């Protein structure tokens, strides 16, 4: 059931009636929606009760750019000892150079490819030996590293499905398993960056959705197991922040992905769908990538709260009103209704 912060009685609110059909039962009906003012989700005020940061240490994956890069700098400013896991540390990416240029003993970049067990194990040993008291453990782990792609199911190769899963899902599992002994000793926090696409599917995003649904399930299982051990597990589900994170690297990168995808399609798929349909899907993706929020602060605030609050939330939803409402409808309403609104 949707909940709203109402400024006047429900009966006085503007109403919108949406007709829908139930294909299985052959019935027709209507859904009465009330439009009500909500507190913008991206500006949510979190509970103020927090644990003192002190000398607590955290590891963040995927710090070369995007959320991870911004989060590393923010948590450092909050007083944390930050280990910034970077895919391109060995190659000196711009993000690594900027973080290293801060020349702080409390901000250390670490080479970390979440797909390689040897790098994950090496990072765990480096971080353990860098802690003031390894027996007290590591306070926080933020699994942020991730990649994405787009394309209908018939446009997406099995190699692409595996590549996205290796980073987003198995990378999260791999890093978590490597650092859980340290997290358990500290009775600390695990914060997994999922997505609104981990709660609701969308067209042309199946590789990404599959992995983020998996992160959600993994996080729930881990939360149940860690509860009696004093470790708290939270999931952050950002909305559309592609414009802020440059996840696709701009329209040129999208076109490059699209051209490669088209060239590798089986001839029967190209003939059945046609280039016009394919190009329309690419254009929609370009529009989506340039229409999102350019401000990462809602996500940064959510992760910070999950790491510092005495009682962190199970899930955080830093997203604008449109995506928040859509997620509620797609996860709480019968499929016949949500399909009628967003598909038919």
UniProtKB/Swiss-Prot annotation:
Q: Which residues carry this modification: Phosphoserine?
A: 246
Q: Which UniProt keywords apply?
A: Acetylation, Allosteric enzyme, Glycoprotein, Lipid metabolism, Membrane, Mitochondrion, Mitochondrion inner membrane, NAD, Oxidoreductase, Phosphoprotein, Transit peptide
User: Where does it mainly reside?
Assistant: mitochondrion
Free-text activity regulation comment from the record: Requires phosphatidylcholine as an allosteric activator for enzymatic activity.
Task: State its location(s).
Answer: Mitochondrion inner membrane; Mitochondrion matrix
Q: Where is the active site?
A: 208 (proton acceptor)
What's one GO-annotated cellular component? matrix side of mitochondrial inner membrane
- The entry annotates sugar attachment on 219
Q: Which Pfam families match?
A: adh_short
Q: Which family does it belong to?
A: Belongs to the short-chain dehydrogenases/reductases (SDR) family.
What protein name is recorded for this chain?
D-beta-hydroxybutyrate dehydrogenase, mitochondrial
Record the organism. Answer: Bos taurus (Bovine)
The top of its lineage is: Eukaryota, Metazoa, Chordata, Craniata, Vertebrata
């Amino acid at each position: 059931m949707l909940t709203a912060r109402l400024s006047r009685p429900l009966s006085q609110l503007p109403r919108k009636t949406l007709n829908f059909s139930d294909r299985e039962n052959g019935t027709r009906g209507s859904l009465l929606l009330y439009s009500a003012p909500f507190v913008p989700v991206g500006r949510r005020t979190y509970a103020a009760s927090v644990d003192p940061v002190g000398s607590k240490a955290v590891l963040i994956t995927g710090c070369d750019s995007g959320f991870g890069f911004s989060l590393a700098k923010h948590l450092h400013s909050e007083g944390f000892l930050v280990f910034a896991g970077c895919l391109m540390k060995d190659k000196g990416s711009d993000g690594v150079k900027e973080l290293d240029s801060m020349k702080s003993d409390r901000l250390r970049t670490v080479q970390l490819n979440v797909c390689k067990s040897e790098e994950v194990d090496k990072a765990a040993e480096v971080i353990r030996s860098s802690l003031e008291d390894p027996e007290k453990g590591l306070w926080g782990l933020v699994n942020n590293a991730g990649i994405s792609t787009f394309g209908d199911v018939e446009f997406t190769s099995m190699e692409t499905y595996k590549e996205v899963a290796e980073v987003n899902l198995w990378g999260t599992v791999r890093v978590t398993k490597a650092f859980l002994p340290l997290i358990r000793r500290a009775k600390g926090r695990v914060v997994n960056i999922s997505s609104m696409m981990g709660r609701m599917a969308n067209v042309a995003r199946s590789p990404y959705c599959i992995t983020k649904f998996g992160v959600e399930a993994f996080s729930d299982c881990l939360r149940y197991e860690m509860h009696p051990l004093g470790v708290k597990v939270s999931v952050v589900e950002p909305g559309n922040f592609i414009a802020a994170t440059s996840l696709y690297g701009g329209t040129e990168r999208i076109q490059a992905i699209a051209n490669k995808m088209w060239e590798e399609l089986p001839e029967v798929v190209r003939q059945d769908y046609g280039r016009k349909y394919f190009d329309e899907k690419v254009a929609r993706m370009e529009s989506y990538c340039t229409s999102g929020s350019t401000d990462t602060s809602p996500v940064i605030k959510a992760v910070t709260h999950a790491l510092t609050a005495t009682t962190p939330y199970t899930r955080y939803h830093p997203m604008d009103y449109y995506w928040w409402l859509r997620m509620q409808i797609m996860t709480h309403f019968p499929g016949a209704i949500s399909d009628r609104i967003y598909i038919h």
